[in-house]
A protein has these predicted regions:
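Short acidic/histidine-rich motifs immediately flanking catalytic phosphotransfer sites
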Residues: 66-74, 267
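A charged, aromatic-enriched C-terminal amphipathic alpha-helix characteristic of glycosyltransferases
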Residues: 332-365
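Conserved acidic donor-binding segment of nucleotide-sugar-dependent glycosyltransferases
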Residues: 314-320, 329-334
């Protein structure tokens, strides 16, 4: 249902969404839809005038925007913007309010910095981006406190969400009587997948959204790997860019649908330990796909843990033994797994759709420092 946000008697709110996008499908396919293009869906569903500009085209942002005026700029996201050689200085005078999203943790533990030295470098690059924004929305609840203190800017917590249209109503019987993990295999995940206790009940599933045709089309898009020459000032951006964006949307939506359908192949979706200290996109994707989700319980993040009730809407674990027990519960009692999955879908539909999250961001920006409650 479409709602109208903005002035009650005035025009709709106008937001420029600056979206991080990679040039190659090999890297770009790992960008979760629910953390990128979904925000465009959520803005439009709320009656907000939205123009999205992706990073391959940010050098032409003035040509693309033309004479348009904006109330806000949303930068999605600073975690990935720091991977590109791009300055956000261009966006400072595009709108008085500039909201920077952070979809990865900014701060990490000492042992994580030692295992992944690039995290320190990324933090330094992210820190440089904060001077260009007026508001910060972070996925890690501890970062919310730290960033607000360090940069003295309004900061809100931003848990993952899912566009309502991608929440499945009917789900078929799983093809495999196993729990599945889909995603990057790094760090401790390698050992988890080799655990003897888990070998017969947990399988790794390769991403289903890596088809050669889609990868080739993505890489050939204007401004991308093989189409960079079309992002040239000799070509009129206001003609080329809308066509580019339409093709990109189609590829992103198709890949997202294939990803969700792939999650339905197993009896449960497993979220293995990860670096970000908030539920990864895999959790909300698994819940939306209609399968019970068994997730690593993130230490020292009570708000995150409270998003979904353990044993009723999600199943949590901290050790390989606990993970094996939770998987066995689902495999031995399919009705129990279906109840967990249905309860979770109900929760997502009521409180964690992207449409709802967009409303929360807009209202928070309008009433800075107003706390958001996601625990219902």
């Amino acid at each position: 249902m479409k709602t109208q946000l903005g002035c009650s008697n005035g025009p709709a709110l106008r937001i420029l969404l600056v979206q991080a996008e990679n040039l190659r499908w090999r890297q770009a396919r790992s960008y979760p839809y629910c953390l990128n293009f979904a925000f465009e869906d959520g803005l439009r569903a709320n009656g907000i005038e939205c123009l999205m500009v992706t990073t391959p085209w940010i050098s032409r942002i003035r040509d693309i925007c033309g004479e348009k005026q904006f109330d806000q700029v949303w930068i999605n996201d600073l975690s990935h913007f720091c991977d590109f050689n791009i300055s956000l200085e261009e966006i400072i005078d595009l709108a008085p309010i500039r909201v920077g999203f952070v979809t990865e943790s900014v701060d990490y533990y000492q042992d994580e910095y030692e295992a992944f030295p690039w995290l320190r470098e990324r933090r330094a690059r992210i820190d440089k981006q904060f001077k260009y924004v007026t508001h910060i929305a972070a996925v890690d609840e501890q970062d919310v406190l730290n960033l607000k203190q360090r940069f003295d800017k309004p900061t809100m917590w931003l848990p993952c969400s899912m566009p309502e249209g991608y929440i499945y109503e009917q789900v078929s019987t799983p093809a495999k009587k196993m729990a599945l993990f889909s995603g990057s295999v790094y760090g401790k995940r390698v050992n988890w997948l080799k655990e003897p206790k888990l070998k017969t009940m947990l399988a790794y599933q390769k991403s289903p959204n890596s088809r050669l045709v889609d990868a080739t089309l993505f890489n050939l898009l204007p401004g991308h790997r093989f189409g960079r020459w079309m992002n040239n000032r000799l070509f009129p951006a206001h003609h080329i860019y809308p066509v580019y964006l339409d093709w990109l949307r189609q590829l992103r939506r198709k890949a997202h649908t294939l990803w969700l359908q792939g999650m339905q192949a197993g009896a449960a979706v497993v979220n293995l330990p990860h670096l970000v200290k908030g539920y990864s996109s895999r959790v909300i994707e698994g819940l939306a796909s209609g399968r019970p989700v068994i997730s690593w319980e993130i230490p020292d993040r009570p708000k995150n843990t409270a998003l979904f009730e353990d044993g009723h809407e999600i199943l949590l674990y901290s050790t390989p033994e606990q993970l094996a027990t939770q998987i066995e519960r689902v495999l031995s009692d399919p009705d129990f797994g279906e109840r967990i999955a249905q309860n979770a879908r109900n929760k997502v539909r009521r409180f964690h759709t992207t449409e709802k999250r967009v409303q929360q961001i807009v209202h928070w920006v309008g009433a800075t420092d107003e706390a958001q409650d996601y625990r219902y």
